[in-house]
Swiss-Prot record:
The entry's keywords: ATP-binding, Cytoplasm, Ligase, Nitrogen fixation, Nucleotide-binding
PROSITE patterns assigned: GLNA_1, GLNA_ATP, GS_BETA_GRASP, GS_CATALYTIC
Any one GO cellular component localisation term in the record: cytoplasm
Record-stated family: Belongs to the glutamine synthetase family.
PANTHER family for this protein: GLUTAMINE SYNTHETASE, GLUTAMINE SYNTHETASE CYTOSOLIC ISOZYME 1-1
Gene Ontology process terms (BP): glutamine biosynthetic process
Entry keyword annotation includes Ligase: yes
Signal peptide per UniProt: none
Protein name, as recorded: Glutamine synthetase nodule isozyme
Location in or out of the cell: Cytoplasm
EC number: 6.3.1.2
Catalytic activity: L-glutamate + NH4(+) + ATP = L-glutamine + ADP + phosphate + H(+)
GS catalytic domain segment(s): 106-353
Amino acid sequence: MSVLSDLINLNLSDTTEKIIAEYIWVGGSGVDLRSKARTLSGPVNDPSKLPKWNYDGSSTGQAPGKDSEVILWPQAIFKDPFRRGNNILVMCDTYTPAGEPIPTNKRHAAAKIFSHPDVVAEEPWFGIEQEYTLLQKDIHWPIGWPLGGFPGPQGPYYCGTGAEKAFGRDIVDSHYKACLYAGINISGINAEVMPGQWEFQVGPSVGISAGDELWVARYILERITEIAGVVLSLDPKPIPGDWNGAGAHTNYSTKSMRNDGGYEVIKKAIEKLGKRHNEHIAAYGEGNERRLTGRHETADISTFFWGVANRGASIRVGRDTEKEGKGYFEDRRPASNMDPYVVTSMIAETTLL
C-alpha cells in the first residue's frame, strides 16, 4: 500500500511540464457528476485556452446511441487537491456537436441572465448553504446510526462535538481544506440537526461563479466520500419521520440591497419572489415536497411568507439586516439536490429583470 500511496502522490513537476486536467460535468439525472482526465502540454489558467472535449452521452443518459457524442466546453478552472501541483479541475458545460446546449446544461441559460446589463450592474452575491447526509455504504443508513435502529432524538447534534454526537468530521474537514486549496470560496462548515448530516457554505460569490463553485465543491466531496467508502446523499428528506431534511438555503443580495435604503429594495424583491412562488418551487429540486412540510425549520410548500429571524419562513431576513436597513435575505426553499445554476439565475431574473 505504501508504494501505491507514493505513486498517487507522485510529484510530476520534477520530471515533466505536462499536467492532468480533470474535466467535470453534470450527468443525465441533473444531480450526478461525471468526470474524466486528459494530459495537457503545460499549465493552463484560462478556461478559454483549454481544448473542448467529448464523451459518450448515451452512457450518461444525455444522448441516443446512434448519435452519442456530447461536447464539453471548459468554463472554470480550479486547482486539483487530489493530484496537486499544476494539475487542475475543470468545470464544463455540455453541448451537441452543432453547439446547442443539451437539456441538462443549465449553465448556458444562467450565463445569459448573469450577463444581462441590468444584472451585471447590480453585482448579485450568493451564499449557498449545502446540506448533505453521509450514509453507510452497504445499507444506505446514516453513519453513526445503529444498524436497523435510530439514535436519540434531535437536539444534541447540531454543531455538536463528541463521538456520540458528531459522525464523519474527518470527511468534513478534509473537504473544507480541499475546497480552500482548490480556490473555492468556501466560507464554513457545521454539523446539522440530524445526526450524520452536515453543511458547508460557498460564497459570497458573484453571479455564475456561485454555481461553478458549488458544483465543484460537490464534486470534491463526492471524491472524498468515495475514498472514505461512504455514500454522499443529497436527498432532501433522506429519513422519513421526525428528522430534519436537507436543503440548500440560498442567501442573496444586490448592490442596491447592500447600500443605504437597501431594506426597502429587499422587501420589494421578496414580493416579486412571492408572485412566482410556484415556478420557483418547481425548479428548486426533486422531492422537495417531502421536506417543505411546515415542520423541521421549513415553510409549507404551498405557502409563501417571509419573516425576520424566522427559520420557519419561505424567506428569512436576518436581524442585522433589519437593524442596519440594508444587507441580504435567505431563500430557504431550495432542496439539497437543487441545481445552483437554476436557483441563482432564477432569483436574479425574478428580482432584477
